[in-house]
């Protein structure tokens, strides 16, 4: 419900009329502690309950003034608490920058270590590998999994997060989206893959992820589940990395029904998905 920002200096700034500006009562609370406490889940829940409006909900200045907060009477304790969380925020920022750098490095390496623009040779290769990559159909190396959870072998509902992979639905959404009866869902085993046809920011053609975190789980039949036909010929980790690239996007774009998107869900059949091209090196290079 909105956000809280603390002015970092004594310069003057211009704010929109939808922004509430306020100062502290210095003998009751420190600026840093107030900035910290206003970002807590408890205060967020209070503000959410007081919010009004349609799509863009907001909290009035009058409502904001009624929010109760708990504060230590000792000003030194307030400063120490604020200092701890400020330090944590700083560490989060540093790690986020490292993550961003590594993410960009991975993206650049994926671009250069997989063939592109019809070539059978990637721009960067490991020493000792010079052979052309082989063009195959995805369906040549994987097979569809349509195993149902008929005997209720698993009660763990999964969802596909483009960022985190196949994860527990309850943990991810903080809620159970799947129906209580999951006997008609697909039963997915560790090491198998699933294609989520839903588009999202950064994933315009959905996402393909492998089940790594759990031994088994269940997925809605809206997803396309598949496994590798021959593990001795196709490396599972290679396929995982391949689907982190955009090399398969063109194949999906060519086969998805033109303009057919139902609330962000691509209209592509399993047969068409398995018909997309994939380029493979030797098993050793994979």
Question: Which positions does each model-derived feature cover?
Answer:
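Non-catalytic DNA-recognition/assembly elements of restriction-modification systems
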Residues: 125-149
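Amphipathic alpha-helical segments with low aromatic content
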Residues: 67, 73-134, 282-285
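Short coil/turn segments at secondary-structure boundaries
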Residues: 49-51, 151-159, 254-256
């Amino acid at each position: 419900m909105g956000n809280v920002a603390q002015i970092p200096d004594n310069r003057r700034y211009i704010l929109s009329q939808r922004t509430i500006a306020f100062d502290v009562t210095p003998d009751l609370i420190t600026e840093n502690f107030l900035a910290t406490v206003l970002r807590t889940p408890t205060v967020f829940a209070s503000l959410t309950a007081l919010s009004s409006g349609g799509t863009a909900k907001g909290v009035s200045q009058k409502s904001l003034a009624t929010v109760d907060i708990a504060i230590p009477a000792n000003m030194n304790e307030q400063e120490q608490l604020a200092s701890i969380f400020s330090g944590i925020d700083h560490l989060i920022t540093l790690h986020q920058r490292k993550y961003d750098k590594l993410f960009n490095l991975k993206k650049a390496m994926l671009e250069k270590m997989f063939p592109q623009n019809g070539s059978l040779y990637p721009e960067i290769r490991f020493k000792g590998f010079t052979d052309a990559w082989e063009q195959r159909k995805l369906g040549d190396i994987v097979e569809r999994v349509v195993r149902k959870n008929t005997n209720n072998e698993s009660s763990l509902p999964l969802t596909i997060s483009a960022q985190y992979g196949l994860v527990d639905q309850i943990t991810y959404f903080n809620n159970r989206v799947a129906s209580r009866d999951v006997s008609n869902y697909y039963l997915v085993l560790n090491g198998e893959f699933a294609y989520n046809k839903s588009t999202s920011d950064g994933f315009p053609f959905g996402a393909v992820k492998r089940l790594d975190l759990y031994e088994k789980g269940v997925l809605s039949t809206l997803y396309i589940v598949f496994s590798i036909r021959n593990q001795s010929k196709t490396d599972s980790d290679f396929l995982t990395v391949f689907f982190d690239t955009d090399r398969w996007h063109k194949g999906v774009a060519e086969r998805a029904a033109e303009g057919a998107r139902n609330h962000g869900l691509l209209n592509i059949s399993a047969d068409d998905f398995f018909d997309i091209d994939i380029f493979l090196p030797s098993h050793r290079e994979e």
